[in-house]
Design a protein with these regions (language model features):
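Basic, Lys/Arg-enriched alpha-helical interface segments
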Residues: 1-82, 90-95, 102-128
Length: 128
């Protein structure tokens, strides 16, 4: 089954897998588009849209180890919910938002391992 990707309004190169918005709302428990976490994500997506790979110099963007194909995360570490958004660069510098989750287990990294697996499967479904 191939996942659909949808271009996000207001961005040139940012796309999200179908269901991403609902997944994000569930993770941050926030339905208001002008809420704290929606505003944070929108700001970070503007940086990503404008800067591409240069965004990785921002401390809130990080490459993910052991991901294949290579993926990255946007983080909001000092927030109560500690959300993460996993994304990948694809053709022509487009960015696909693949998965969002709440990091709760820093010691074991199990949240990341599980989330990376979900994101890898979604990306493979899209590019196949």
């Amino acid at each position: 089954m191939t996942l659909q990707v949808l271009k996000l309004n207001g961005f040139n190169r940012i796309y999200a897998v179908e269901g991403f918005a609902e997944e994000f709302e569930k993770v941050v428990s926030e339905k208001k588009l002008d809420g704290r976490y929606h505003n944070w994500l929108r700001r970070k997506l503007y940086v990503l849209d404008d800067s591409g790979y240069v965004a990785l110099s921002d401390r809130d963007f990080e490459p993910l180890e052991n991901s294949d194909p290579k993926m990255y995360a946007i983080r909001y570490p000092k927030s109560p919910k500690n959300p993460r958004v996993i994304y990948a660069y694809v053709d022509n510098g487009e960015v696909y938002l693949l998965h969002t989750f709440k990091e709760t287990s820093k010691k074991t990294g199990s949240d990341y391992r599980s989330a990376i697996k979900i994101a890898e499967n979604r990306l493979k479904s899209i590019i196949e």
